[in-house]
């Protein structure tokens, strides 16, 4: 039986080896080393040959990393070498594209699972064979799966609350008059409780000095039971009457007597309406004056109460301080600078 060295000297073996080298897929020649920089290679055939050489090294080391007899340190070293070979392969593929060759990176797709999601660990640093079972790596894959599940749940909850109307978020509660009345009652009770607590703390026994609850919001809102069309008709009624009065002045002469009677009745109605308006305005003015007097008395009482609390201060301390003029301020700054120069040079 012939030895390997004798087989290597045969004519057929040398012919096949030279043929593979010429095609760019042959084995590495004796003493021939792969260039460290892919950009240093200017031949497309040589670049194809070195890429094939890297693929054979990757295949051999991926098969070797499956060995159960290897230790964890050897598995880590082999996995690092495989990732380094993948980086070199990418560099040679870029050089092949620059030299006008085929684009091998176009055929490399993204690995996905049954649900169409990208498999973790397919980008950047990869783990092969037994490297996926190393301590710390298995937890990394489990964590990425849990993170994807949490992101899908977060997206589902976002879609659930995405197309909800303003009623869902309580933006239409202010249109409910009953709810506003209830809130006003509770706010009034809370106001009165806090006022009593503050009065007991400050030692105020007179209830007339206590601040009253502000005007409720519900009193400013229109009544929901009244139809808005009815309100519009009431607003348009005086405009129609004015137009009718203007139109009566342009009637024919034969209806002059009837028009005079109608105008007389309308004038009487207008005078009565003016009287009622003046009466209501007088009443409103009297009520407003009474409210102003009450507010003035309340302010005076509050000022008296504040003066009682501030009895420890004299009148001069409560006055507004007198501000220095521009010249006085310049003199003060000049004195400060002189004092600083004296301290700097030791002159006292």
UniProtKB/Swiss-Prot annotation:
Nucleus recorded as keyword: yes
GO biological process assignments: generation of catalytic spliceosome for second transesterification step; mRNA 3'-splice site recognition
Entry-linked InterPro entries: Helix_hairpin_bin_sf, Isy1, Isy1_sf
GO cellular component terms, A-Z: catalytic step 2 spliceosome; cytoplasm; post-mRNA release spliceosomal complex; post-spliceosomal complex; Prp19 complex
Keyword Transmembrane helix listed: no
Listed SUPFAM superfamilies: ISY1 domain-like
Keywords, ordered alphabetically: Cytoplasm, mRNA processing, mRNA splicing, Nucleus, Spliceosome
Function: Involved in pre-mRNA splicing.
Stated family: Belongs to the ISY1 family.
Quaternary structure annotation from Swiss-Prot or TrEMBL: Associated with the spliceosome.
Protein name per Swiss-Prot or TrEMBL: Pre-mRNA-splicing factor ISY1
Originating organism: Cryptococcus neoformans var. neoformans serotype D (strain JEC21 / ATCC MYA-565) (Filobasidiella neoformans)
């Amino acid at each position: 039986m012939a030895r390997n060295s004798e087989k290597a000297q045969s004519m057929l073996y040398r012919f096949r080896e030279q043929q593979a080298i010429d095609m760019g897929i042959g084995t590495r020649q004796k003493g021939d080393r792969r260039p460290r920089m892919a950009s240093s290679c200017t031949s497309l055939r040589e670049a194809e040959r070195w890429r094939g050489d890297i693929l054979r090294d990757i295949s051999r080391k991926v098969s070797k990393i499956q060995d159960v007899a290897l230790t964890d340190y050897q598995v880590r070293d082999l996995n690092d070498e495989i990732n380094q070979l993948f980086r070199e392969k990418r560099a040679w593929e870029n050089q092949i594209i620059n030299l006008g060759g085929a684009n091998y990176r176009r055929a490399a797709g993204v690995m996905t699972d049954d649900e169409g999601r990208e498999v973790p660990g397919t980008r950047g640093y990869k783990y092969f064979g037994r490297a996926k079972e190393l301590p710390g790596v298995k937890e990394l894959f489990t964590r990425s799966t849990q993170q994807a599940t949490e992101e899908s749940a977060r997206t589902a909850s976002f879609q659930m609350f995405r197309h909800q109307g303003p009623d869902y978020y309580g933006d239409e509660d202010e249109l409910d008059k009953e709810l506003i009345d209830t809130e006003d009652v509770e706010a009034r009770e809370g106001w009165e409780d806090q006022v009593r607590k503050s009065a007991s703390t400050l030692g105020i026994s007179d209830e007339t000095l206590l601040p009253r609850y502000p005007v409720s919001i519900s009193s400013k809102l229109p009544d929901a039971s009244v139809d808005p069309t009815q309100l519009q008709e009431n607003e348009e009624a005086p405009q129609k009457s004015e137009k009718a009065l203007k139109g009566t002045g342009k009637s024919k002469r034969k209806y002059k007597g009837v028009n005079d009677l109608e105008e007389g009745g309308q004038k009487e109605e207008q005078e009565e309406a003016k009287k009622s308006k003046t009466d209501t305005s007088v009443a409103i003015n009297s009520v407003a004056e009474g409210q102003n007097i009450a507010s003035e008395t309340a302010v005076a009482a509050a000022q008296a109460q504040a003066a009682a609390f501030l009895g420890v201060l004299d009148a001069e301390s409560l006055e507004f301080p007198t501000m220095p003029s521009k010249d006085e301020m310049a003199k003060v700054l000049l004195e400060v600078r002189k004092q600083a120069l004296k301290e700097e040079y030791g002159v006292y």
